[in-house]
Amino acid sequence: MSNSENTGRIPLWLVLTIIGLAAIALLALFFYGSYSGLGSSL
């Protein structure tokens, strides 16, 4: 058990969760922007 590996570092599952949420948020923003923009123009 080497504690020096995890000291001062963010856990991998937390990083993956944040990256996943950010990717979903970006996709949602792109879809919402294209939908509202194209929908209102049409």
From Swiss-Prot:
Protein's GO biological process: photosynthesis
Subunit structure: PSII is composed of 1 copy each of membrane proteins PsbA, PsbB, PsbC, PsbD, PsbE, PsbF, PsbH, PsbI, PsbJ, PsbK, PsbL, PsbM, PsbT, PsbY, PsbZ, Psb30/Ycf12, at least 3 peripheral proteins of the oxygen-evolving complex and a large number of cofactors. It forms dimeric complexes.
Subcellular compartments: Plastid, Chloroplast thylakoid membrane
Originating gene: psbJ
Transmembrane portions of the chain: 10-30
Protein name: Photosystem II reaction center protein J
Keywords of this entry: Chloroplast, Membrane, Photosynthesis, Photosystem II, Plastid, Reaction center, Thylakoid, Transmembrane, Transmembrane helix
Protein species of origin: Euglena gracilis
Role this protein plays: This protein is a component of the reaction center of photosystem II. One of the components of the core complex of photosystem II (PSII). PSII is a light-driven water:plastoquinone oxidoreductase that uses light energy to abstract electrons from H(2)O, generating O(2) and a proton gradient subsequently used for ATP formation. It consists of a core antenna complex that captures photons, and an electron transfer chain that converts photonic excitation into a charge separation.
Topology in membrane: Single-pass membrane protein
Phylogenetic lineage: Eukaryota, Discoba, Euglenozoa, Euglenida, Spirocuta
